[in-house]
Structure formats: structure tokens, C-alpha cells
């Protein structure tokens, strides 16, 4: 396997409905799609990964935690540079007004075009109810996002993304991976492939 898969995951704060608008816009601007900051910086500008994205995943139930996630599919020999680039982005959010405006427009159009019909009305109601939201919140999200500025997004990033401690998962050919580069991220725990992909019975973890 020439390509290595890397997943960065951090447990965030407990779900807060007041952050839904900011997290929705943030995901479009920062981590999702070909025009996002993460993809443009890591894939297009620096050619450090085949694919890359990041997202702030909100909980699906009130009282549960949100999660910060980032992913890269990169060549094993590019792991050191790719990790440095990703961690820099997850610590210091680049601010590009043109991309921010485009992300806001795309997010607003997506909300405006969303149609919930038939049985989906019930399931949407149930999903919102689990979050402690008693009514359709799309209009409120739209109005909030419409008024948001880069400063609002920066404040959201600094409070919810910057400074998080990540668990990093790597899948790849062991002989091609730079373990010294990974050691800079923390303690390494190697998992046996038979443990990960054992479909017959679960054995004890081989270290």
C-alpha cells in the first residue's frame, strides 16, 4: 500500500444548539468540498495528499459531545509534511474573504433548497427532538448564517477547534511509514491487522 490513510479525531464540547449555524458554515468554508481551505491548502497548493477534508461533527443527541475530525489520504513518504500542514491548519485558520463569501452563499442556497416531505417530516422532527429543539430551525439557521462575518467564524474556530488534542489513526504499509514523525504526535499503539479485520472472532489485541 503506497497510500496511507490518516484520521485525526478529538472530542469537543457538549452539543450547544447556538453553535449549529457557525458549525454549518465552518464545515463548508474550512473542510468540505473542493473549494474548502483544507483541500486547497493540502491537496491543491502543496500536493501533500490525494484527498483531504475536515469537519466539526455535531452530536445527534442533547447532552452528548461534538467531535472535530480531519482526514488525509497521502503517500507514506509525505506523512511528515502532510501532518505538519494539517496540524497547522487545525491550529491557525487561514482567512480568505472571497472563499468565505462563496461558502456562505453555498450554505444559504443549500438550506433554502432543502425540502422535507412525507415521512421525512416525522424523522426530522424526531432528530431535532433528540437535540432538544422543538421546532424546525432552518429559518433561524439561515438568518444567523446570513449575518455572520469572518470574525464570527474565527471566534468559533478559536473556541472549538484550535488547541484540541487529537487521537490519530493511521492505516498503511508499516515499512513505508515514518514512525519518528508519528512519535511527535504522541504515544504510538500498533494494532495487528488480524485484530482489525478478523471477521470470525474477536481476539485479544496484539501489541
Regions found by a protein language model. Name each.
Residues 89-95, 183-194:
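A common structural junction motif
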Residues 170-172, 179-186:
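Amphipathic, charged alpha-helical segments and their helix-to-coil junctions
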Residues 184, 193-207:
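Extracellular/periplasmic ectodomains of large secreted or surface enzymes and adhesion receptors
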Residues 16-18, 78-81, 175-180:
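Short, conserved charged micro-motifs
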Residues 2-14, 23, 27, 39-151, ...:
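M16 family metallopeptidases and their MPP-like homologs
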Residues 151-158:
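Mature hydrolase/peptidase catalytic cores and their serpin-fold inhibitory cores, especially
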Residues 18-25, 30, 177, 186-189:
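PPIase-associated folding chaperone regions across multiple families
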Residues 38, 82, 156, 178-181:
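Hydrophobic side chains in well-ordered alpha-helices
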